[in-house]
């Protein structure tokens, strides 16, 4: 049985692509028809591709590797945080900082700084400082938390990256490709599918569509983790 049904995809609006003037010809194979100036995505292909992506993500989690969820557009931010947190994985939902993967050692130092500030605050170290200094440190901590909070527990590079809108997240996709980290993505009609290892053709703008797909990817992680526990 498929991970997601045609009915669920239709109800979430996964089939609505972009306007016909905003498209990538490489997506032609995933387009069912054109209606009122909008491309309609072939959901039969989405179901098949989704099953393959699900199995892959499950295998990554079963191997004890991490999955990094990436979605910085407004429609994806909350869902990406919720679903990554639900399955115990990492996320970037504000801004992709260049080098998050390719310059991970430097990013890791910033994460350690964030943890250090949290520890100092918890232990009461801020109490002996001036109000001005405390305000500066709190501001630094909040900024680090905003951009790096989702990868705070990521102590090594992930085994896969899940992306909402690879066109917007092109830097994240490029970094993953450079490091040979497989990319799973919701790919709308204006995106280039050639850059993605596991294409999920679908609407990357509707909140319900993003929620449905992201939640199933999180389910794949949880199922894979169960498999890891059984085999270890």
UniProtKB/Swiss-Prot annotation:
Disulfide bonds, paired cysteine numbers: none
GO CC annotation: cytosolic small ribosomal subunit
Record-level GO BP terms: translation
A Pfam family it matches: Ribosomal_S2
Claim: Nucleotidyltransferase is one of the keywords in the record: no
Domain of life: Bacteria
KW Ribonucleoprotein (keyword) present: yes
UniProt-recorded Gene Ontology molecular function terms: structural constituent of ribosome
Keywords from the UniProt entry: Ribonucleoprotein, Ribosomal protein
InterPro entries according to UniProt: Ribosomal_uS2, Ribosomal_uS2_bac/mit/plastid, Ribosomal_uS2_CS, Ribosomal_uS2_flav_dom_sf
Entries under HAMAP family matching the protein: Ribosomal_uS2_B
Family to which the UniProt record says this protein belongs: Belongs to the universal ribosomal protein uS2 family.
Protein name: Small ribosomal subunit protein uS2
Annotated organism of origin: Syntrophomonas wolfei subsp. wolfei (strain DSM 2245B / Goettingen)
Gene name linked to the record: rpsB
């Amino acid at each position: 049985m498929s991970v997601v049904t045609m009915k669920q995809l239709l109800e979430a609006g996964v089939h609505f692509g972009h306007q016909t003037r905003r498209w990538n010809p490489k997506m032609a194979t995933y387009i069912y028809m054109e209606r009122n100036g909008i491309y309609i995505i072939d959901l039969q292909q989405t179901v098949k591709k989704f099953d393959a992506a699900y199995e892959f993500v499950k295998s990554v989690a079963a191997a004890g590797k991490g999955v990094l969820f990436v979605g910085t557009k407004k429609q994806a931010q909350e869902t990406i945080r919720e679903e990554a947190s639900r399955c115990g994985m990492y996320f970037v939902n504000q801004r992709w900082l260049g080098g998050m993967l390719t310059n991970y050692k430097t990013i890791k130092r910033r994460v350690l700084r964030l943890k250090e500030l949290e520890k100092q605050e918890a232990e009461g170290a801020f109490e002996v400082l001036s109000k001005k200094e405390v305000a500066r440190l709190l501001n630094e901590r909040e900024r680090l938390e905003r951009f790096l909070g989702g990868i705070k527990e990521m102590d090594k590079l992930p085994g896969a990256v899940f992306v909402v809108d690879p066109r917007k997240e092109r830097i994240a996709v490029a970094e993953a490709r450079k490091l040979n980290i497989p990319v799973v993505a919701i790919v709308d009609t204006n995106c280039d599918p050639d850059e993605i290892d596991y294409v999920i053709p679908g609407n990357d703008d509707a909140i319900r569509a993003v929620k449905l797909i992201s939640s199933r990817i999180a389910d794949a992680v949880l199922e894979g983790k169960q498999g890891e526990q059984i085999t270890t």
